[in-house]
Amino acid sequence: MSEGYIVLVMQLVLIELNEINFEYAKKYFDILKIDTIKNINKELIETESENSDEMLEPWIQWHSIHTGCTAKDHGVFRLGDAINSKKIQIFEELEANHLTVGSISAMNSINNLKNPSYFIPDPWTNTKSDDSFFSKIITLVLKDTVNNNASAKFSIKNYIYLIIIFLRFV
């Protein structure tokens, strides 16, 4: 006689929306009849961590969200400062609890994952992507584009990479 097993598959999707006005967004959710987004909107959790305006910068707030610490506790106050932080992020916590973790451009987060499914850092944080070819070239194109934005430079190499990325994913 064979034994039966129940396999529980747990999924968590964290979508980070930066500087969204939810009053306006809700109107679009209603007009476009996007039920999934409307359901997410019903279950929003509002939190407070800072009470001074200078601590409300998104790169500070996102690191607070990723670590569960206040700005004072994590000490990250500028874009890219996360690389100096020793705080454990949600990504490592999830991986330690046997979840597969992937991240695309989570602001001011660092790749301390042992085995990411994928990891593409934000363009301002000097941390590595995962080891896949596509994550590496997407990271390179993002960083080059953002960091050379003021000079309006876009290299031929990046155009070629974009074509490769487009052909692979679109």
Q: Which role fits each region the language model picked out?
A:
Residues 1-9:
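Short, Lys/Arg-enriched N-terminal segments with co-localized hydrophobic residues
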Residues 2, 60-63, 125:
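Short linear interaction motif-like sites in intrinsically disordered regions of transcription factors
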Residues 9, 17, 34, 112-117:
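Intrinsically disordered, low-complexity regions
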Residues 10-25, 65, 94:
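Beta-strand elements within well-structured catalytic alpha/beta cores of enzymes
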Residues 23-62, 70-73, 100-102:
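Short, structured active-site-proximal loop/turn typified by the sulfatase FGly-forming signature C/S-X-P-X-R
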